[in-house]
Amino acid sequence: MWLTFALAICLGVVVLYVPGYLVGRAVSLERFASVAAAPAFSVVALVILGVILNAAHVRCDGWMLLLACAALCLLIYGACRVLRGLRGVDGRTHLTRNAVDSEWILVALYVGVAAAVSLVVFVHAMGDPVSFSRNDDTTVHLSVVRGFLDSGTFSTLNVTKYLDLGESGGYYPAAWHVVTAVVASLVGNQVALATNAMILVVCVFVLPVGLLFLLRQLFPDNKLALYAGSLFSVAFCGYPWGFVVFGQLLSNLLSFALIPGALGLLISSLNASGPSKSGFAVAYACNMISVALAQPNGAFTLGIWSVAFAVSHLWSKRSDGYWSGKRTAIILCFIACAAWVLLFVAPPLQGVVTYSWKSTLSIPKAIVAGLLFMFTNREGVQPFLTVLVLLGIAKTLKDRRLRWLSVSYITAFSFYVIDVATDGFVKQLLTGFWYTDYYRTGAMTVLFAIPLAALGFAWLVKLGTGLLGKMRFGRQGSNNSCVVAMVLVVLLAVC
């Protein structure tokens, strides 16, 4: 059974990365960017094909949907290569051998650390590959996947728990379920096993690799922060593990995991030039769609992060024309706020934005709980992460280019406090897109805290190295940094 589970994990990686990688290369992304964007491309292709086949009254097995997806992505890759050849455009990105080697070393580090943590936190507690949580949301997830498999239809426009019994369904953000059904079809339709495998694929591969791609854009000259980032992709209880022990919120798990890579693509698109610039823009748009297909509130989470970065980028941009950077940034803020209000009053979303969870904490307690990353009673206090995030915020105050990271985090933190400690119109307006669910707004806060934690860890290592060098009569070097880093890793593990 464990060998089948390992096979399911490998198949999950293939399903998410192989088809999408071809599309990434087709739109002129360099290899690592194509890997980071691959899950989003694959998700969009699988969901669209599922809808089209169902509309055409074509029933198929999950592995057949995967073959169709691979064929479509291969066709896109071939067509783009031919078009570039006819136009005489070289869409390749040339990197030095050292840069390429460094990228894949970091990928191995991020995936390795996430795998080690996941083995301890998830696999050890799981007990058996076919175990499953007996929560209400989990039974729905398993039933939807089973319905896809038994009915031979994979349309997110026709989702119900009883699809295999002929019941007509409706729209549901079921990207997670489509992907899981495809994986399950390759391992004997074992739904629970495929679900557990996909949880690991998201936590060990999708989230860490996307985070690495984002941090490479944020900290291009801070190697220590890049290496430190490997410690934090799955270090917080609030996300991803909060979504695994509560609900389970598996659609949100995938949606949020796609967000770091998507933001990295936006940053790359604004900094790139040549054919890759449009490629990054296409990849970002596709990532936004995939995030929404997995769970729409993820699109709002990505929107907050994206607008914060875009405003910061425009504000610092020098221009003498009428459309100066600052003027454009202000207009973008107004457009974002107007779009928020329009979506809040949109009839299709009323069932979501009017749903309300009652407040459970006072405002002071909510602030303390949020600072300690104990967003609910199912999660633990993590004081060392608090220190690192606060140090990261302090560091951004010294770097105007990164201040938007702190603004985003404070915004998400405020949403969580309002969500868990108040009731009324303001709560619905600000957090209604997340069902006023403080598990989800808390997870958003965690997501925005991860880069700050990496930045704070790197800064603390530098401070500790300097202090240790002075204590050792001025001798400084890489050994001091290693000692300090090891001490901090131990503190992270126990605190």
Model segments located where?
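Hydrophobic, aromatic-rich transmembrane alpha-helices
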Residues: 310-311, 383-406
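Membrane-interface helix-loop junctions at the exits of transmembrane helices
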Residues: 45-49, 119-126, 151-154, 226-245, ...
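Membrane-embedded, hydrophobic transmembrane alpha-helices
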Residues: 1-107
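Active-site lumenal/periplasmic loops and adjacent helix-entry segments of GT-C-fold
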Residues: 106, 110-257
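Membrane-interface alpha helices of multi-pass inner-membrane proteins
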Residues: 278-296
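Membrane-interface transmembrane helices that cradle and orient dolichyl/undecaprenyl
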Residues: 259-280
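Signature aromatic-anchored transmembrane alpha helix within multi-pass, membrane-resident enzymes
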Residues: 330-337, 459-495
